[in-house]
Amino acid sequence: AAVAAGIVAFAHGSDGGGSVRIPASSCGLFGFKPTRARLPDGPYAGEGWAGMAIDGFLTRSVRDTAVMLDACEGPDLGAPYVAPALGRGHAAAISRPPRRLRVGICDTTFTGEPIHPEVAEAVRAAGRLLESLGHHVEPARPQADVPMMMRAWTDIVGVGSALSIRSKLGDRAPRPDEVEGVGRGAWA
């Protein structure tokens, strides 16, 4: 909200299921979830949610995000691996003419349900813009078993969260001041 209101130029966020990308798309911002290990998570942080939770940015433009990536990317202390650097930088790459891309656009949900007409038109307008820039654009809808995806996502998040909690608590039970009432029941 602060970026969309013009209070700040960028904001940090972590994204494991859309926490950066979804708010950005609702506010007219650019939300970016980079490749794993592109940005540091903090000393010895490892991976949140088995690598699905990734630190990223919300900005007003691709250019702002590229500048932030140049400023922030790199390994951190104790990182199990690191994404290789781009070379001459993300901001510099923006000024390079892009190669012709093959782009699939989807103006429905994964299950084929219609989306809001204004959103569908925005998707098609983006496709027309990409075509005008010389890219090949075609309709596409990934085939996805959405219930199975959600089950797998929930399992990964649950296990990742449990491992994170276990790493902090060790073998002791949580104290009442550490867990909300509902959480205490779930813990049992």
Write out the residue ranges for each language-model feature:
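Short glycine/serine-rich loop segments
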Residues: 1-76
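Short low-complexity, flexible loop/linker segments enriched in glycine and/or proline
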Residues: 25-28, 151-158
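Acidic-enriched catalytic cores of C-N bond-cleaving enzymes acting on peptides and small amides
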Residues: 60-87, 112-145
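Short helix-loop capping/hinge segments that flank enzyme active sites or metal/cofactor-binding pockets
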Residues: 92-106, 156-188
